[in-house]
Structure formats: C-alpha cells, structure tokens
Curated annotation (Swiss-Prot):
It catalyses: ATP-dependent cleavage of peptide bonds with broad specificity. The lineage of its organism: Bacteria, Pseudomonadati, Pseudomonadota, Betaproteobacteria, Rhodocyclales. NCBIfam families: ATP_dep_HslV, PRK05456.1. InterPro entries: ATP-dep_Prtase_HsIV_su, Ntn_hydrolases_N, Proteasome_sua/b, Proteasome_suB-type. One of its GO terms (molecular function) is threonine-type endopeptidase activity. The gene is hslV. This is ATP-dependent protease subunit HslV. Belongs to the peptidase T1B family. HslV subfamily. GO terms for biological process: proteolysis involved in protein catabolic process. The active site is at 7. Protease subunit of a proteasome-like degradation complex believed to be a general protein degrading machinery. It comes from Aromatoleum aromaticum (strain DSM 19018 / LMG 30748 / EbN1). GO terms for cellular component: HslUV protease complex; proteasome core complex. Its EC number is 3.4.25.2.
Length: 179
C-alpha cells in the first residue's frame, strides 16, 4: 500500500529568533488527500518547534517518541534528538519508519533523519521534504541578502517551493520562537 507523503518543512533562524513552517498538502500516490494538514507544531510547553515530512503515521510515532525524550531530558533538544536516534538505530519498528523530523529551539536547529542520524545544518536553515531543496535555496538567498525576519523568509520560501514542487501547496502554518 502506498504511503501518505510529500511536503515541505523549512526552519530559518536569525540569532535566537527561529521560525519553522510547512505546507498543508498530503498526497497518496498522485492524489491530494488533504490540503490543510498541520505538519508543524510547538512542543514541550511551547519552547520547541517541530515539523515532519514523510509518512504521516510514521511521523506521529516519531513525534511521540521525541516528546517522551524531551520530557526525560528536561527539554534538552540535542540530547533528546541523539537519544531518539540511538533508539531509531536499535529498534526494529523504528527502523521501518519513513519520516524525518525538523526541530528547533532558540539555540539549535536539527534534522532527525530516517536513518537515525542527527544533523545540524549550516547557516541556520533546515529544509526537509519533497520541496525542501527549493525552499532552502530561496531561504538562503533571502537570509544572506535581506534583513527580513525569519518568519517572513520562511513564508516567502514556502511560497516559492509551492510554485515549483507538485507535492507542496500554498496552505502554510508558520510558528515562531523568540530566544
């Protein structure tokens, strides 16, 4: 059976201000199933932002596991991500999950990959999903050449990705944290 997939998730930071946004499209094969899905949300008492790309059910499983790690490690994003990655590599069920998480707090921006890797991308930009490369390119240009706040960069970059990627739409959810 085909999985629900296709999205763009983007996080941009300037200093300790970080925005994380995503589009709302969910597809099953070549059919749009939902246009207003919420794939980005604040977690851990609103102090951390998280977004997912990949299989929806798989992503919710990862969200739950990551939130449990955050509780265990008092909201330490990096430690929680590393501990989740360790579980991911050793747990048979987790290894079968087809999803990625983008997480950010005022100090860290991370990608937790489907291989159980934890990556801290350069330049404060995290982009995952089918439209991630388009959004990342736009965000990098805007971050380097304008004084726009992170949420505006995320908004404009998601719009560009939605114009180019057939699995990304123009229904956006953008969350912001101020450090």
């Amino acid at each position: 059976m085909e999985q629900y997939h296709g999205t763009t998730i983007l996080s941009v930071r300037r200093g300790r201000r970080v925005a994380l946004g995503g589009d709302g499209q969910v597809t099953l094969g070549n059919v749009v199933i939902k246009a207003t899905a919420r794939k980005v949300r604040p977690i851990y008492q609103g102090r951390i932002l998280a977004g997912f790309a990949g299989g929806t059910a798989d992503a919710f499983t990862l969200f739950e596991r990551f939130e449990a790690k955050l509780e265990k490690h008092q909201g330490n994003v990096l430690r929680s991500a590393v501990e989740l990655a360790k579980d991911w590599r050793t747990d048979r069920m987790l290894r079968r999950l087809e999803a990625m998480l983008a997480v950010a707090d005022p100090d860290n921006s991370l990608v937790i990959t489907g291989n159980g890797d934890v990556l801290e991308p350069e330049q404060g930009i995290v982009a995952i999903g089918s439209g991630g490369a388009y959004a990342q390119s736009a965000a990098r240009a805007l971050l380097e050449n304008t004084a726009l706040p992170p949420e505006e960069i995320v908004k404009k970059s998601l719009q560009i990705a939605g114009d180019l990627c057939i699995y990304t739409n123009q229904s956006h959810v953008i969350e912001v944290l101020e450090g």
